[in-house]
UniProtKB/Swiss-Prot annotation:
GO terms for molecular function: cysteine-type exopeptidase activity; dipeptidase activity. It holds the Pfam family Peptidase_C69. This is Probable dipeptidase B. GO terms for biological process: proteolysis. The active site is at residue 26. The gene is pepDB. Its EC number is 3.4.13.19.
Amino acid sequence: MINKKISLGVLSILTAFSLQSVSYACTGFIIGKDLTKDGSLLYGRTEDLEPHHNKNFIVRLAKDNPAGEKWKDLSNGFEYPLPEHSYRYSAIPDVTPNKGVYDEAGFNEFGVSMSATVSASANDAIQKIDPYVKNGLAESSMTSVILPSVKTAREGVALIAKIVTEKGAAEGNIVTLADKDGIWYMEILSGHQYVAIKFPDDKYAVFPNTFYLGHVDFNDKENTIASEDVEKVAKKAKSYTEVDGKFHIAKSYNPPLNDANRSRSFSGIKSLDPDSKVTYKDSNYELLQSTDKTFSLEDAMKLQRNRFEGLDLKPLDQMALDGKGKPKSKKAVKGYAYPISNPNVMEAHIFQLKKDIPAELGGVMWLSIGSPRNAPYLPYLGNISRTYEAYQEKSTQYNDKSWYWTVSHINDLVAAHPKPFGTKVIDEMKGLEKTWIAEQDKSTKEISDLVVSDPKAAQEKADKISLDRAEKTFKRLKAIEAKLVKEKPKNKKGLNRS
């Protein structure tokens, strides 16, 4: 997410040691269907900003729009005409729309799924030639404008391209859209430049906040959508770079790789493929990664929970600080880095798409509202029309009826007291997920069969299953929260430590 800063403690560490105090945000991934054990396409993202930032999970119902009505982004002034009819879609919005809606991810009623965005930024030379447009298309509007307007993933990419061409982009972003025919990966590079590719089925990718596209065949119109002046702008900026005699997009548009992007690229690739030849010292990481391994949904969850397990790195948030929240010395920083699973993750989602799931369902979104570090991923089919009430609490401070705030509190308690609480919570969450994965295959098949003959009954069944599971899980999370509060260590005066 652009303009979404990491927590002050971590930011002060990065600033003090020149590790580049820029916006650190989401980490995305894609695993092509040829690389999964069950033939699923897997993709998703962690959404990062800061601790204690509420996220909701809702369904925006289909509606007719009056002629001339526009979408208006209160955070930057962007406007765009609404379609005559907006399609139903699920969303994961912020609760402060005046600062941006940030619908982030979901399915629409035609089975198009979308995750938007992973923020990135062009180098200074590029921005001087094709600067970002203040009231252009931003992450805050992306999902809200695209998902209710398109019937295929390619249509979604084409609509983004049209908007960026006509109105400009407010920021650099990486967007992923998918449907039953596959997934598109799109980089919005500068004010009016973009490139999108149909992602190969036999590759995987991990992408934090920098651009990754290398050489792209612009003549392959079936699998590529690109602005006309991508190369021209790079040449005019004098940042045009070739690799093996061919134009390289990332090397032409990126600033130097910073440490937070390096650590997440490296650890993400190694999480999926420990035998990968990438190193922590690589100057850049390619988007399209190859392997002879196959992956499961659990591997994707493990990736989003990664905190450098098995690597010679330690999470930055575990560093000992002085009384002012700063590192005790430069030497104390050595060996610490910014992980994918960090204190600023507000939610994480994984889309699981299978060829035999009807377009009316789209697939399954596995969703953790709140960081999945000590919280579960719950499955949601793309045809749901309602979400559990605890997902809809809009408070900007702790609220005991809120899913996000309950999970946030659990994460805070476990992080503050790792010795007594250990891995008890996450171990239970993984046990629940294992059960749900087995159950979901069965219910997805049943609802897939039903949707052909009776779409309304299929939707009602999907709603009931997901609502019942969410209610039961939330009650368990409240019990865990209460137990942790009761059992947390007390200070010398006998008071509970937060």
